[in-house]
């Protein structure tokens, strides 16, 4: 059951250049376990609660009336900035595990390559289990423990179990919000 429709909003931030410049001023680290490509900043709730709250409210307002919600609505959210350079060409199909209800991605790269973005994927054949050894190659690949050739072979092997359903291009200041349990890359 999908909790939210895939939603795309252009012009997400009122001052995207300011947000981008702030993001680039922060320290970002790669994940030690290789859970994601590139590097991420610390949780925005800890380093800039005002921006974090503004962003969460803006996302929530895409689906619910939040004008009077300050007194009685609470949420748990985690967010930060992720920096991925152009050498990372294609993603690994995955879903966000855990209790997350939805995922939001806001693109802040001006003049991004038109082939980049986020796609929603579907399992090709639900009767086929993806072999564990294929799924388990993602983390060593993102930790650069595999050669680029072996990492690409592993990514293609995993992604072959899925078919692209929706594609959202990377456009400056565009947000995509979707159910966290949907497969995406």
Language-model-derived ranges and their functions:
Residues 1-91, 117-118, 124, 131-145:
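Non-heme Fe(II)/2-oxoglutarate
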Residues 84-183:
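Catalytic core of non-heme Fe(II) oxygenases with the double-stranded beta-helix
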């Amino acid at each position: 059951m999908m909790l939210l429709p895939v939603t795309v909003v252009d012009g997400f931030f009122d001052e995207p250049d300011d947000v981008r410049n702030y993001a680039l001023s922060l320290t970002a680290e790669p994940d030690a376990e290789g859970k994601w490509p590139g590097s991420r900043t610390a949780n925005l709730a800890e380093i800039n609660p005002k921006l974090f709250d503004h962003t969460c409210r803006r996302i929530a307002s895409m689906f619910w009336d939040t004008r009077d919600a300050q007194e009685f609505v609470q949420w748990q959210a985690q967010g930060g900035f992720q920096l991925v350079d152009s050498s990372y060409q294609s993603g690994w199909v995955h879903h966000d595990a855990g209790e997350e209800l939805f995922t939001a991605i806001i693109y802040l790269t001006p003049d991004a390559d038109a082939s980049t973005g986020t796609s929603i994927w579907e399992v090709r054949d639900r009767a086929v289990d993806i072999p564990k050894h294929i799924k388990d190659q993602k983390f060593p690949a993102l930790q650069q423990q595999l050669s680029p050739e072996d990492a690409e072979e592993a990514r293609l092997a995993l992604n072959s179990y899925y078919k692209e359903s929706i594609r959202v291009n990377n456009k400056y200041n565009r947000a995509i919000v979707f159910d966290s349990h949907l497969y995406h890359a």
